[in-house]
A protein has these predicted regions:
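Sec/Tat signal peptide C-region and signal peptidase I cleavage site
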Residues: 16-20
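Early extracytoplasmic/lumenal segment of secretory-pathway proteins
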Residues: 21-93
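Short beta-strand->loop
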Residues: 26-30, 130-138, 147-149, 170-184, ...
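A structural signal for short loop-to-beta-strand junctions that line the ligand-binding cleft
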Residues: 78-88, 106-145
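Ligand-binding "clamshell"
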Residues: 100-108, 129-132, 261-275
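Ligand-binding pocket segment of bilobal, Venus flytrap-like solute-binding proteins
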Residues: 187-189, 193-270
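Mature extracytoplasmic/periplasmic domains
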Residues: 280-281, 285, 289-352
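Conserved C-terminal helix/tail region of periplasmic/extracytoplasmic solute-binding proteins
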Residues: 345-377
Length: 377
């Protein structure tokens, strides 16, 4: 998707026809996010609720896409608009906190039937901000350790076991450091959760304490030694590529990318995943609804449909290899055994609930990345 300037973004919204039955959904993310709404979710909603239409407006990939939605909300709040021109937005986790603290969002989750199907902590806290009730996860993306069982018949179940394995098998573990993709960043954050010497829950949920950052010296020294013994890859895809060619036997990956590569024949079907204790970070994208949305009742119906077990199974799991936003056990009955076993045979719903961690809150996240740059050469 081409990047859209803030001015162009505003023009697109201004050009949308105003109809009582038209629901406007703004979504950050790649073009596949817009296509998902325009080609699947929107038509399904229109069929379920005849007479209504859905319009998706894509704001661009990555954090910049969510930033544009936040800026749109800022502009409408500054203009004191009675009704806002976005009914539903899909945004990255880190932008929900500012939206809640600025009182932009409706606390709608308890008003929809699927609200009770959400169990993960990231629907309550978003990088240190209490967002409970304001969000419904569209999906959860997760990192894990991919491995070749022909080389690693008994994969490490914890970071401590992983460190021992890598020491015994030089250059067979590969990761991209903190450049070229967040799979490596996630691995580093998990290392600090495991060996940082402080309280991992404080890193995830706050509050920020400068003293906490001074506990990491030993963890970064051990990570520097570990990295000397590892293979540095060029990025998310680079790790998968080296795995596929047998140049490494283990490395951190995004689970959806892993399964997509397998489905496309780019990765051997024998490759497997493990989520080591105490866990690795992932992140959701959230459905939010502005407090001043023009079509709030319709927006609630849209989000309820989007987070229903059937749609989560067909739209999120089957189409994208993402983990569902609602508790996976509620989706299982809607999936055939082959699909369920593919996505959950290595990492179970219980594993996700226990070890699918959030990234650290922003100040800790920044401090960890800066410390990595200084400590790991």
């Amino acid at each position: 998707m081409k990047k859209m300037s803030y001015a162009a973004f505003a023009v697109v919204f201004a050009a949308l026809p105003v109809h009582a039955e038209e629901l406007t959904v703004a979504t950050a993310g790649d073009q596949n996010m817009v296509d998902y709404i325009n080609q699947y979710l929107g038509p399904l909603f229109e069929k379920t609720y005849p007479g209504n239409t859905v319009r998706a407006v894509g704001t661009g990939p990555g954090d910049a896409g969510s930033q544009k939605i936040l800026e749109r909300f800022d502009a409408q709040a500054a203009a004191k608009s009675d009704k806002w021109d976005v009914d539903v937005a899909v945004v990255h986790e880190k932008f929900v906190g500012p939206m809640v603290t600025k009182n932009y969002l409706d606390k709608y989750r308890s008003d929809i039937e699927t609200g009770k199907l959400v169990t993960r902590a990231n629907a309550k806290m978003a990088l240190g901000t209490n967002v409970d009730g304001y969000v419904m996860p569209m999906f959860n993306s997760q990192t894990a350790i991919a491995y070749n069982p022909a080389v690693v018949p008994n994969p490490p179940k914890s970071y401590a076991e992983l460190a021992d394995w890598a020491k015994a098998h030089p250059k067979q573990f590969g990761y991209n450091g903190i450049k070229g993709g967040a799979s490596g960043v996630s691995f580093v954050m998990g290392w600090i959760y495991a060996f940082g010497g402080g309280d991992a829950n404080t890193l995830m949920n706050g509050p920020f304490k400068e003293d906490e950052t001074k506990k990491w010296d030993t963890a970064f020294k051990s990570l520097a030694d570990f990295t000397t013994n590892a293979t540095l890859t060029p990025g998310n895809a680079g790790t998968l590529d080296l795995l596929s060619r047998g140049e490494i036997a283990m490395g951190p990956v995004w689970v959806d990318m892993f399964y997509s590569w397998q489905a496309n024949g780019q990765l051997p079907p024998t490759m497997k995943l493990v989520l080591p204790a105490p866990g690795m970070p992932g992140q959701p994208m959230h459905y939010v609804m502005p407090e001043k949305a023009a079509h709030k009742a319709l927006a609630e119906k849209f989000i309820a449909l989007a987070t229903s077990p059937k749609v989560q199974a067909e739209g999120i799991v089957k189409r994208f290899n993402w983990y569902p936003g609602i508790d996976a056990d509620n989706v299982k009955r809607e999936l055939d055994d082959a699909t369920w076993n593919k996505l959950f045979v290595d990492i179970s719903p219980a594993d996700l609930a226990a070890k699918g961690n959030p990234f650290p809150i922003a100040p800790y996240n920044t401090a960890i990345l800066e410390a990595y740059e200084k400590s790991v050469k």
